[in-house]
Amino acid sequence: MVLALLLLPATLSYAKPYELRMLNHWDNLDGTIERGYAGRSIFWPKLQRDKIEEYARYNEQLGINAIVPNNVNASPKMMTDEILQQTKELADMLRPHGIKVYLAINFGSPKALGFCETADPLEPAVAQWWVERCKRIYQLIPDFGGFLVKANSEGQPGPLDYQRTHADGANMLARALKPYGGQVIWRAFVYSPSDPDRAKQAYLEFQPLDGQFDDNVIIQIKNGPIDFQPREPFSPLFAAMPNTKMLAELQITQEYLGHSMHTAFLAPMWTEFLADVNKVAKCKLVGLAGVSNVGDGSQAGNAPTVLNAPGVQSPLFTLCGNHVAEANWYAFGRLCKNPGLKAEAIAKDWANIFFNEQQQMMDSQQRRGNTQKPENSLTTLLPRKDAVKVLTSMLMRSREAVVDYMMPLGLHHLFAWGHHYGPEPYCAQPGARADWMPTYYHRADAEGLGFNRSSHGGTDATHQYPAKYAAMLDDMKTCSYQYLLWFHHVGWGEQIRHKVGGRAYEESLWLALCRHYQHGVDEVAEMQKEWQKLEGNIQPAIFNDMTKRLECQYRDAEWWRNGCLLYFQTFSKLDLPQFVPSISHSLDFYKSVNLGLTNYECPTIQLLDEKR
């Protein structure tokens, strides 16, 4: 872990820090972490005090000032005295570091815990129960931040169960918190299985409620209208609720970008989003909430075992699943404090800090006589300036590489069922909701590919955006190629203009699709080459671990390219171009791959080698 942070002057531009700079943890009371790829919870079932102290110091230096330590799919037990007492102990640990604790709550808690016959927010007994709970919480935690609520989404209870609105539910809680200065953060991640376009749902449910929320209610909105895809347009809600406080939810953990196995530096995604929110939506956010990638470091099977003397921490230990993934935690914190930073400047700063840490750790090992030489005896130490340049380049190309080999040109939701690791554009789960299936999103057929969200025979999702931006998106000729298949169903032979690796092309959709998938694979190969240049600058254990992860990422990129192109080829009936290498496996082989993972783990390299 990087603890001696040096927040270097990355750029002369400066923007005012966000008021609320929050991490959301999807940690469960049993210690599992939903979409967690770095081990088990440091908060539950018991407080891991040494790791929490390390976590708190790091957050303090980044400027994080609030956390939610539990899953938004919250247990009603969060409101029991036992859990509140443990939360008090956590708050006591974080307070010296300037960090407030909020709790995610289950809206149905008064009913689920047996205190009320209903959870109707307009029922006086329900409102009074929350008043009494808030009174107890603030007796224990005087600076308690408030509640985070996921309601009427993916099976969670909420006010709509009682024919009430989101505003009714949020305001009832807000009034219970109001005397103590507490806030309600109400998530806008909602979607109905019956609507023809999931991307429109949050707007349809929340935009009519603009101005109806109390002043201590904040609406937390995911950056895009679906769910943390490698690339999404910004959610139209950011441009549609001028009388409501809004918080942007970003995902630091890589649920859809290769878990802790793939290198994907997310600052370019976030700065792209913030630029659109500022310039197009003209929205002033209250803050940022990042879905954290922190665990206790116990994620098994991905890294070689390292034996250490008693009291000496393994060089492979990290709270983030792998050492390079720490860059995303760092980038999130930097953007919270200064939203005007450029992604490349953040990458450069983190690379400097990373190499400082590596040098300190190697010096410490040398003093103890515990030096491990690089496997290649000819390895040389790059000058610091050159090493930083190489790592910065690798980070900056990584996210776009992931977009290209997973879901280019605006494709989305092509991942595997359940655990979301690997490609499954052909996924078909009997009895499952249509909007959980990739076919709902890619709409591949003999004519073409993509979801028609235009006003020309589509769902007209484009017109949820501001007028000029909507007009640009609505026209296939002016819509950015990066969002083309998000908003349009495009013919396989239709000529499109796009860019790959900075070079412009005008060619058929099929050729463009193939070119992006191949470019993504090629970019991972370049990332591997860049990493190899750094061998002498990095502890051997960490260098070798990341080398193996990058090898795995390359094979995964090929898996994505092969599975997706073979599948889409069944519709296009077109040959693969010469720049795509021959694919040795059949589509049936890729359809047969089943990793058997849960939502709480990252696949091991061994498992991936066996299965794909």
Listing of model-derived features with the role each one plays in the protein:
Residues 289-358, 378-612:
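Catalytic domains of carbohydrate-active enzymes that cleave complex glycans
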Residues 42, 81, 89, 115-348:
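Catalytic-core regions of glycoside hydrolase
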Residues 3, 8-10, 358-381:
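Short, basic, low-complexity termini and linkers enriched in Ser/Thr/Gly/Pro
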